[in-house]
A protein has these predicted regions:
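Alpha-helical transmembrane segments of multi-pass membrane transporters/translocases
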Residues: 3-9, 15-21, 26-27, 69-73, ...
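Aromatic- and glycine-rich beta-strand/loop motifs that create alpha-glucan
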Residues: 16-17, 22-64
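Membrane-interfacial helix-loop-helix junctions in multi-pass membrane proteins
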Residues: 50, 82, 162, 213-270
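Short, hydrophobic transmembrane alpha-helix segments
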Residues: 55, 74-84, 212
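Pore- or pathway-lining transmembrane helices of multi-pass membrane proteins that form conduits
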Residues: 59-64, 196-217
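Hydrophobic alpha-helical transmembrane segments of multi-pass membrane transport proteins
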Residues: 67-72, 88-159, 180, 184, ...
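Short helix-capping/hinge motifs at transmembrane helix termini and TM-loop junctions
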Residues: 72-81, 159-164, 168, 195-197, ...
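Alpha-helical transmembrane segments and their short interhelical loops
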Residues: 130-205, 252-279
Length: 283
């Protein structure tokens, strides 16, 4: 005897008629396909919710920049510039740029993690703009970059940083840095798709970012370096980014450096954005 009891008065659902199914399938009034902007914003919101549910991932965005600012200002400020306060005026824009560029690698790590979980298999079946998933990651990470900028600036102001460019110069410098970081993050999305594990993505990212950030004009003036090292520092893209941000915050806008950063960001976006989407479509 079956263990499932059947109620005598329970209504029996009739099977749908073939003509009714056909009418639904061929109906012309179908839901409108979401726009590229709406899907990108949706995926960006998804990335922000990850931060909400795992707030400890903001440790690198907040604690690390504060530690670097305090350590370099008070340990080396007197020896390098005569006083910690004077050195802070030179150091803080560089610390802000290096901290944000360093945390761009987490975009690639997030992409690689979702691939390993199989989330992208579902994304690729959706009738949406294909790059929106990648763009969403970057939009969500823009919140990280903004938080890092505000934290570093706040600590700097408490320590005695006084930007000559005022509020407008600081805001413009942060916007330029965020725009370049958005383009720069596409490098790590490519590695997130290309490499097999998140540890590999982190290893490659650190191998690239550490030389770029430390062999630059962030901590000292390149004029004090040996000639062979100065030659590398002068062509280092981080050097140009820091120089542009530093000039805007000080009020002495360097049009050449700002233009260089904008053009370099566009080139990086065009190259690595294209490579990322090709890998994504073949993954």
């Amino acid at each position: 005897m079956s263990t499932t009891a059947v109620k005598e008065n329970e209504p029996v659902l009739a099977a749908p008629k073939p003509e009714d199914l056909a009418a639904v399938l061929i109906a012309k009034n179908r839901p409108q396909r979401p726009s590229a902007l709406s899907t990108s914003v949706t995926f960006g919101w998804r990335a922000m919710l990850k931060i909400k549910h795992v707030p400890e991932q903001l440790f690198d965005v907040t604690a690390f920049p504060i530690m670097m600012t305090l350590m370099f200002t008070y340990l080396f400020g007197g020896a390098l510039s005569g006083s910690p306060t004077e050195y802070l005026q030179f150091l803080l824009p560089g610390i802000m740029a290096s901290s944000i560029l360093m945390i761009t690698m987490y975009t690639g790590i997030s992409v690689n993690t979702d691939i390993e979980k199989g989330v992208f298999d579902r994304f690729r079946t959706l009738p949406i703009w294909r790059p929106s998933a990648m763009v969403g990651y970057l939009l969500g990470d823009m919140l990280r970059y903004l938080i890092a900028s505000v934290v570093i600036l706040g600590v700097g102001l408490i320590m005695g940083f006084r930007p000559g460019g005022g509020v407008g110069g600081v805001a413009a410098a942060i916007l330029l840095l965020l725009a370049f970081s958005f383009a720069f993050s596409w490098i790590w999305t490519m590695f997130g798709l290309l490499l097999r594990s998140e540890k590999s993505v982190m290893g490659v990212s650190m191998m690239v970012l550490f030389p770029l950030t430390f062999l630059s004009n962030i901590y000292v003036d390149p004029k004090t370096m040996p000639g062979w090292l100065q030659a590398f520092v002068d062509v280092n893209p981080v050097t140009h980014v820091v120089a542009a941000v530093r000039s805007m915050m000080s009020g002495d806008w360097d049009g050449g450096e700002i233009t260089w950063v904008l053009i370099a960001g566009g080139v990086i976006l065009a190259i690595f954005g294209t490579l990322t989407m090709r890998l994504y479509n073949r993954k």
